[in-house]
Amino acid sequence: MEPACKYDFATSVLFTEAELHTRMRGVAQRIADDYSNCNLKPLENPLVIVSVLKGSFVFTADMVRILGDFGVPTRVEFLRASSYGHDTKSCGRVDVKADGLCDIRGKHVLVLEDILDTALTLREVVDSLKKSEPASIKTLVAIDKPGGRKIPFTAEYVVADVPNVFVVGYGLDYDQSYREVRDVVILKPSVYETWGKELERRKAAGEAKR
């Protein structure tokens, strides 16, 4: 019999923060090896990290420091992209906002995403960035959910795989909540079912979302 989950909103913990960090160090070693001939240097030629907000902020903060442990200099940039609303499934529409991104022409770019699910968001992000003609562009995802694909896409680097369930924690959210949870957990269906009904009730009553 499995022990009870320590989170009352989750059915189980898939990966603890410590387990993720161990896996991230393994990925960082691979990245350091793969870019060893790219002459990466602070200021002159850092690896440009493009973090996809909002979900990747926790992952990015940890990953760039771990990359630093392996001698990989980085510059961090952010863009906003989303294909989820209040639901647990992608709505299929991708909104990418990359205003203010540095000039990546001729630079080595590594896109960091919290979760690779349908692949619609990451495909749109990569295609958008390629227009700026970087020297190279690769993707690193904290969580890969292969069962959720709507289009073919393979990330060059993956920290952990999960089954086709809805997960939160370590920056991953459900309707902007649960990002602060340190571990990656499976959200109880009762949570999003109840909240979905509440949103419908408020909509019908003409109430603003709190």
Curated annotation (Swiss-Prot):
Pathway: Purine metabolism; IMP biosynthesis via salvage pathway; IMP from hypoxanthine: step 1/1
Reaction(s) catalysed by this chain's protein: IMP + diphosphate = hypoxanthine + 5-phospho-alpha-D-ribose 1-diphosphate; GMP + diphosphate = guanine + 5-phospho-alpha-D-ribose 1-diphosphate
Positions of the catalytic residues: 117 (proton acceptor)
E.C. code: 2.4.2.8
CDD domains, per database record: PRTases_typeI
Keywords attached to this entry: Cytoplasm, Glycosyltransferase, Magnesium, Metal-binding, Nucleotide-binding, Purine salvage, Transferase
InterPro entries, per database record: HGPRT (IPR050408), Hxn_phspho_trans (IPR005904), PRibTrfase_dom (IPR000836), PRTase-like (IPR029057)
Entry keyword annotation includes Nucleotide-binding: yes
Alphabetized GO MF terms: guanine phosphoribosyltransferase activity; hypoxanthine phosphoribosyltransferase activity; magnesium ion binding; nucleotide binding
GO biological process: GMP salvage; guanine salvage; hypoxanthine metabolic process; IMP salvage; purine ribonucleoside salvage
GO cellular component labels: ciliary plasm; cytoplasm; cytosol; glycosome; nuclear lumen
Enzyme class: transferase
Cofactor or coenzyme needed: Mg(2+)
Pfam family membership, one: Pribosyltran
Cofactor note: Binds 2 magnesium ions per subunit. The magnesium ions are essentially bound to the substrate and have few direct interactions with the protein.
Binding site for Mg(2+): 173
Binding site for GMP: 54, 113-121, 145, 173
Principal location: cytoplasm
Places the protein is found: Cytoplasm
Top-level taxon: Eukaryota
Function: Converts guanine to guanosine monophosphate, and hypoxanthine to inosine monophosphate. Transfers the 5-phosphoribosyl group from 5-phosphoribosylpyrophosphate onto the purine. Plays a central role in the generation of purine nucleotides through the purine salvage pathway.
Record-stated family: Belongs to the purine/pyrimidine phosphoribosyltransferase family.
Protein name: Hypoxanthine-guanine phosphoribosyltransferase
Species per Swiss-Prot/TrEMBL record: Trypanosoma brucei brucei
Lineage: Eukaryota, Discoba, Euglenozoa, Kinetoplastea, Metakinetoplastina
